């Protein structure tokens, strides 16, 4: 198999799930769980090691709420089914996973993504040359606005929002530019029983017009002097969704795209929405990731939100993003 192209999405998901269900392979074995000192500049934490036929994964949680770093695997190499299944399990358990020091040119980035889902094109920003599914996420030295600079889950204004997103760092500032992530399982579970009962029956309206989270250098160049409006998208989704793989319930609104509740005005919706927006990003639900060139993050849009911090004015930051097709939230 060509490692640049990777396996097709059926092999990446359906075949692995079939093998797991049939008991044709197990996801390695737990070797140790220990407290260890990470490398320079990295947090200390409990390291969990999974040993498999071809790889030994060292898993280090980034916080008590969300996120884990995975060491011991070269993502540019062809991944066997056991390793893919192990990575997917850590991803489902921790909602966002991080890898460092990865050499992933565009073809190999797409090949990696296809192990976990079907890459899709982003509706507002043109992909890089030759790879329409890879979105450039760029902030130049002179620019003041960053891409997606607020808490959100990607493109919830679509009828079928992406289930996951991969982001790899190509150029990073000398400091700043970290990304925050938040656990929407915890955001739902920490609400009172009465409020959970109320939210379980509500539907939210999500719109691409609420916040200009797609304003990038390319957008500004394209829109300068033009009168034609960009298309707007709107979708209805349950305020609380059930994760199709874990079965857990997660709060599924976000400050970037959710504008109101169905059958309510924005004014009527605002008090409860504003409370929930503040609640779902409480510090105890979050982690913070510092990027280096070659770092890759892979997050689950169905149960996590993210917020790229815009604190590196005067420096250049270049990332490549791949989103994976999802289903309609239920």
Please give the residue ranges for each predicted region.
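Periodic, rod-like helical contexts
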Residues: 13-16, 30
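Non-heme Fe(II) oxygenase catalytic core, chiefly the N-lobe of the double-stranded beta-helix
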Residues: 49-296, 301-330
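Compositionally biased, low-complexity flexible segments
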Residues: 33-43
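Short terminal hydrophobic/aromatic SLiMs and anchors at protein ends
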Residues: 2, 9, 17-21, 25, ...
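Residue-level detector of transmembrane insertion/anchoring sites
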Residues: 5-10, 14, 142
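Residues in and immediately flanking transmembrane alpha helices
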Residues: 15-18, 37, 165, 313
């Amino acid at each position: 198999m060509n490692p640049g192209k990777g396996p097709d999405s059926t092999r990446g998901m359906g075949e692995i799930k079939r093998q797991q269900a049939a008991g044709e392979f197990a996801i390695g074995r737990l070797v140790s769980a220990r407290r260890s000192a990470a490398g320079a500049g990295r947090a200390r934490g409990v390291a969990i090691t999974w040993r498999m036929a071809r790889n030994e994964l060292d898993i280090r949680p980034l916080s008590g709420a969300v996120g884990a770093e995975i060491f011991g695997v070269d993502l540019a190499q062809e991944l066997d089914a056991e390793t893919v299944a192990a990575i997917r399990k850590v991803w489902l358990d921790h909602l966002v996973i991080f890898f460092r020091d990865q050499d992933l040119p565009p073809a190999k980035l797409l090949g990696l993504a296809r192990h976990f889902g079907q890459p899709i094109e982003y509706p507002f920003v043109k992909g890089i040359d030759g790879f329409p599914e890879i979105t450039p996420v760029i902030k130049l030295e002179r620019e003041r606005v960053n891409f997606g600079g607020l808490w959100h889950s990607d493109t919830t204004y679509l009828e079928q929002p992406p289930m996951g997103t991969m982001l790899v760092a190509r150029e990073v500032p000398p400091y700043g530019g970290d990304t925050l992530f938040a656990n929407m399982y915890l955001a739902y579970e920490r609400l009172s029983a009465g409020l959970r009962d109320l939210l379980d029956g509500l539907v939210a309206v999500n719109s691409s017009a609420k916040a200009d989270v797609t304003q990038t250098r390319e957008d500004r160049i394209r829109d300068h002097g033009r009168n034609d409006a960009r298309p707007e998208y709107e979708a209805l989704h349950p305020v609380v969704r059930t994760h199709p793989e874990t079965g857990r319930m997660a709060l599924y609104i976000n400050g970037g795209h959710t504008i109101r509740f169905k059958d309510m005005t924005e004014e009527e919706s605002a008090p409860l929405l504003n409370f929930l927006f503040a609640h779902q990003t409480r510090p105890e639900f979050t982690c913070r990731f510092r990027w280096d060139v070659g770092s890759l993050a892979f997050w689950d849009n169905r149960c996590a939100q993210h917020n790229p911090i815009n604190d590196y004015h005067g420096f250049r930051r270049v990332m490549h993003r791949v989103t994976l097709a999802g289903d309609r939230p239920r």
